[in-house]
Structure formats: C-alpha cells, structure tokens
C-alpha cells in the first residue's frame, strides 16, 4: 500500500478517534509524523494537505525513522483539545 493511501487511512482513524473524544481536527494542537523514507514525504504531504482544516494547521514535525510495526511506512501522533 502506498504512503499516500496509508496516510489517508491513518487520518481517517484520527478523525474517528477525535470524534469519539468529542473533538475534531480543527482542535489539533500538534502533530508528529514518522516516515520510513523521507523520499515519500510528498505522498504524505498530499494526503495531509487535503485533510488538514484550512486556518487550523497545527504545529507539525516529520522525521524519518524505522517504525515499530513492520508493513507500515507512516505513523502519526496528534495532540488535540477536547
């Protein structure tokens, strides 16, 4: 699965978790993103830019790292107000 598709799936899961907590992506304060290969950052950015709420872009850091779960190329952690 491409990084673009993986990122879209992760962002959909973030939407779901935030909704369960009574929040949404406009209340994200900070996001940390990990990629197994920074050469795929364009795909990740395409998904991110299409998802993030205009006027509510949180602080964000993206780094290259080996991920704990094999088979995944992107991991995203967000902190949001509820």
Provide a role label for each language-model segment.
Residues 1-82:
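Short, polar/acidic, helix-capping and beta-turn segments at strand->helix junctions
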């Amino acid at each position: 699965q491409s990084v673009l598709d993986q990122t879209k799936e992760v962002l959909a899961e973030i939407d779901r978790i935030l909704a369960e907590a009574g929040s949404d992506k406009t209340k994200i304060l900070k996001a940390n993103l990990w990629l197994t290969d920074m050469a795929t950052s364009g795909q990740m950015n395409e998904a991110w830019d299409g998802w993030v709420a205009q006027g509510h872009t949180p602080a964000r850091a993206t780094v290259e790292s080996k991920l704990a779960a094999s088979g995944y190329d992107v991991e995203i952690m967000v902190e949001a107000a509820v």
